[in-house]
Amino acid sequence: MHWKVAVGVLLALPGPLSAQAAQADSVGARAESAAAVLFKGGEVADAGRVFLGGWAGLVFGEHFMLGGAGITLLEKVELPGSESGTGFDLGMGYGGVILKRWWDLPGRLTGEGGLLLGAGHATVNDRRTGREVGSENFPVLEPEAGLAFRVFRRVYIGASLGYRLVWSIEDLPRVSPDDLRSFSGNLSVRVGGR
């Protein structure tokens, strides 16, 4: 289900938004759109995990993008259990406003930097019963930097490194902010932008 939504956004968004922006602003600078599907690898509670996400936004002057992003953990993390042997599962997702900036490099390469500022939500469930034993909303700040390779005219494959910073985790049993903070390696397919 996640991939269907991501592919739909990737295919549907860039065309209609750039057409609307072109009609609304025929005199000044033209705003276009860009969208991407991304995979993030990093740690959650000392376990290597993969996240699936995407972002979409308006591109101004070919080099600056303002939009929104959403990212979810693909597989829950098993947390240590209590003395009775019951284990717990941690799930999380986050999203928010995303800013991107692209720089022209030689050939088909583009440098990119970005910042996501938003919020996340995590839950801890009893593994045996599935009952939620804790949940928490928390702020997220995630900078990243990387390179993108232009495959076609407006299609790019990118790789970047980032760091997910979270804080104010108080109501999740067996979880601290350090369990949700992590460096990440990111792979993306983007349509639009520079």
Language model features: what each stretch is:
Residues 148-194:
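Predominantly the C-terminal beta-signal and adjacent terminal strand-loop region
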Residues 4-16:
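Bacterial N-terminal signal peptides
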Residues 28-30, 45-49, 88-94, 134-140, ...:
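Transmembrane beta-barrel outer-membrane domains
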Residues 33-41, 54, 58, 68-72, ...:
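Transmembrane beta-barrel strands of outer-membrane/channel proteins
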Residues 19-66, 184-194:
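Short glycine/proline- and aromatic-enriched beta-strand/turn motifs that initiate or cap beta-hairpins
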Residues 36-40, 81-83, 127-130, 170-172:
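Extracytoplasmic loops and strand-loop junctions of Gram-negative outer membrane beta-barrel proteins
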Residues 27-33, 62-64, 107-113, 153-157, ...:
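Outer-envelope beta-barrel architecture signal
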Residues 63-141, 149-151, 191:
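Gram-negative (and chloroplast) outer-membrane scaffold detector with strong preference
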